[in-house]
Every structure is written in structure tokens, then in C-alpha cells.
Amino acid sequence: MHLFKWLAPKKKVAEGLVMRISTADQVDYATITDPSDSDIWDALVQVPVSYDSLYLTYSEKGSMSFIFVESEDDKYRLEHDTPELGLELTNVARVSQQVARDILIRFSKEHTVILDLHWKQEKVR
């Protein structure tokens, strides 16, 4: 099995849009619903290699808030937006507010990152 497995999206009324990433060989419900921080970081590392972009939703289940990470000309663009996420998207993982903040801080230190206005304000906090 390929280490980075994007799981197909599933719609659940109770949870809203459910899309998860897992690097685990054995995929079970816990892996799908609660990816580890290392899974998220591993996925981010793969963005310029295997994927053009990655969406990370955060905060409460069903929340439309997310981080959009895109690799472009050897730079990363981190955006915060609230579009309708279609079911055709499979590169989405839900993370906690803290992990979202960690991504902003740590990823910005390690890479050339272009931030939108929302994340510039978040970085100041």
C-alpha cells in the first residue's frame, strides 16, 4: 500500500463533511476521524512532491474554516477561506485549532510562505 493514502470523502449528517488523510497501513475508524499530527505534517511535506494543494479544516466538526496550502514557484501559499467544499475533493484533513496555529508558525519558519490577511493577523497574536 502506498504510504500516503487519500481517503475518499464520506458525507455524514452528524459530522458534516468528513474527509481524512491517513498514513497508516491499517485504516480504521479512529485513524480516519482523528489523524495524528505526524500524519498531517507528513502530508504537508508531500505537497510540492505529489500534490498541488492541501486543505486542512479545523475547529468544530462541520466547520467550514480551513487552511489551504498550495505549492507555487517553490513557495507555499497559506490561505484562510470559506468556500463550499465539494465532495470531489479528497485532499482534506480535519485538524484542531492548535494544530492549525502550529502549522502557521512552524511551517512559516521552515519554508517560504505567502500568507493572506487572515493569517498575517493570526501570526501577530
Question: What are the roles of these predicted feature ranges?
Answer:
Residues 2-35, 41-125:
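Acidic, proline/glycine-rich low-complexity IDRs
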